[in-house]
Swiss-Prot record:
It comes from the Bacteria. SUPFAM superfamilies: MCP/YpsA-like. Gene3D superfamilies: 3.40.50.450. Belongs to the UPF0398 family. InterPro entries: YspA. This is UPF0398 protein BcerKBAB4_1482. HAMAP family: UPF0398.
Length: 184
């Protein structure tokens, strides 16, 4: 596996409204564990669309992993131009920081937002250009990742394409592990 697409929930879908929320570190730890294993098995690129939440947190994790594995690269393929234009200023600054550190940036449709079709094109692009999908996603709470997860599963039925999931139960295990470690 050379290229993995990473996605997951937007912050509000998780009840997270600031990047210093304890849940963010928990999600990043889960992503770090999975991505480190993938890198040790030959992963070269992580691709994201730059969506707030899991995707940008994954970008931060990639930057951390790059210290030990400098050959790992991050690509941001936005579904449309200027996706951040209606975001709050602090979110825009955070997004621009991530873009400034990315190894590759491009827009899939090369135009500003016009219709939801651009999100469908983004999902198709990500599934076509990656060898696997890593999603912070639990079918019990579908949310925004639902459509790309469905596309990945469909591709997996006809080709050698894998989907890896970080479930709410995985995050709960990490939180309990942290509480246990902090109690010692």
């Amino acid at each position: 596996m050379k290229v993995v697409a990473v996605t997951g929930y937007k912050p509000f879908e998780l009840g997270i409204f600031k990047n210093d929320h304890p849940g963010v570190e928990c999600i990043k730890k889960a992503l770090r564990r999975k991505l480190t294993v993938f890198v040790e098995e030959g992963l070269e690129w992580v691709i994201i669309s730059g969506q707030l939440g899991v995707e940008l947190w994954a970008a931060e994790v990639v930057f951390e992993i790059q210290v030990e594995y400098p050959n790992l690269k991050l690509a941001v393929f936005t579904p449309f131009l200027e996706q951040e234009e209606n975001w709050k200023e602090d979110n825009r600054e955070y997004y621009e920081f991530i873009l400034s550190q990315a190894d590759h940036i491009d827009s899939i449709t090369k135009r500003k937002y016009e219709s939801p079709e651009q999100f469908k094109l983004k999902n198709q692009f990500f599934i076509e250009k990656s060898d696997a999908l890593l999603a912070v996603y639990d079918e019990e709470k579908s949310g925004s990742p639902k459509y790309i997860v469905e596309a990945a599963k469909k591709k997996g039925e006809i080709e050698n394409y894998h989907s890896y999931f970080i479930l709410f139960s995985d995050l709960q295990d990490i939180m309990e592990e942290e509480q246990w470690n902090n109690a010692e």
